[in-house]
Amino acid sequence: YQGIIVAEPTNNLAVTCPRVIASGSIRFHGTSGHSSENSALKNSAIHKQARWSFNALETARKYENKKYESLEGLAFNIGSVSGGIKPNIIAQSAETKFGFRPLPGQDPFEIFTELNAKSVKGQFDFTTGFIAPSLPAKNNSHRLKALAGKLKLELSKPVNFWTEAALFNEAGYDAIVFGP
């Protein structure tokens, strides 16, 4: 065996450098009440969620000019937002699920910390979801490029998607991504 090939559509180019992938969820706590009370601005879990979402998008924008070869910025998405019961009840809880794809070499845990920095402790519960390294996971890109060369495969530029090849590489196996 010379290495591992993970099959993904790559236009017949060998991918040796996709992004990191990370996801998380954050549950916001509020104090229920009737919306006729002026406490809704402060107590609504949905309002806390909205402030977090705004700050998270601003955090992602700060990375717009960061580059790794042909990759740019932090790919960030708020994928699911839920909470509340109805318009005249102050929301006691709300939840946001989000994902992001840092550039290779960026630490997803630092970004999690930055995303949650402006949230008030005790008013939310944060849970990390799926987190996986970039490829190459162990700074061994020369070995991955050599594997592609041995197989006479043309190299791809770094790509935005993530694949399981990074997990094989993190476990010590040379792994590339290749497919039609």
Regions found by a protein language model. Name each.
Residues 1-11:
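A glycine-rich helix N-cap at a beta->alpha junction
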Residues 9, 16, 22-180:
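Metal-dependent amide/peptide-bond hydrolase catalytic core
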